[in-house]
Design a protein with these regions (language model features):
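Portal/gating segments that form or line small-molecule/metal binding sites
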Residues: 1-149, 159-203
């Protein structure tokens, strides 16, 4: 059975993006970037909501091209070797985009679904392949969590209080106990928290 892994940057006060969707509060960390570039190889499918898909396509679609002038994913600046590794992987992955408003998706290996059907996600999980990963996509994260479909939560908590923004789990109405798999502090002050669903059930 394939797993669904959720990865998100998070402020210390629980926001995964600023009020206008910005991520300029993210505290970059070289060690964390190397880990992300290594771990991306364990996944072959990305699940996206519309806004995250559009943000990712705008940057990552061209980030493997050394001649590209696209800005960095969080701040303008020269891309690292790790960014290139992640870009190559993302461009080859299957990308499933959930949106009621998009008419088409043009990124390589992307397909559009207008509704998140838990039965279809279960079918995807039962198929052969590597793990599936969710970046950003607060609404999709909430829906998958509600249906008990996320197997691992990976949160990189940044040392910043934003005061306002978009909470990651604002649409989750059921309690979910988690088991801590790993807690790792990085030199930047970022802290990686990895959790699995306790017993695989929600209540």
């Amino acid at each position: 059975m394939r797993r669904i892994v959720m990865f998100n940057w998070l402020t210390t006060d629980g926001y995964f993006s600023g009020p206008d969707g910005n991520l300029d509060w993210v505290v970059p960390d070289e060690e964390q970037a190397k880990a992300a570039a290594r771990d991306i190889a364990s996944c072959d499918t990305v699940l996206f909501g519309r806004r995250t898909y559009e943000r990712f396509e705008r940057f990552w679609r061209h980030a493997a091209d050394d001649a590209s002038t696209a800005p960095g994913p969080h701040r303008p600046g020269q891309r690292s070797r790790e960014h290139r590794t992640i870009a190559v992987a993302l461009n080859e992955m299957t990308k499933v985009v959930f949106s009621r408003t998009l008419k088409d998706v043009t990124w390589k290996n992307a397909r559009l679904l207008h509704e998140l059907d838990p039965r279809e996600i279960e079918t995807m999980k039962s198929q052969p392949g590597k793990d599936m990963i969710v970046f950003g996509s607060g609404s999709i994260v909430s829906q998958l969590t509600q249906h008990g479909l996320i197997d691992e939560y990976q949160l990189v908590v940044c040392p910043i209080l934003l005061g306002s923004g978009r909470p990651l789990f604002s649409d989750v109405t059921k309690s979910l106990r988690l088991d801590l798999l790993e807690a790792k502090a990085y030199p930047s002050g970022d802290v990686l928290l990895r959790y699995a669903r306790h017993g695989g059930r929600i209540s």
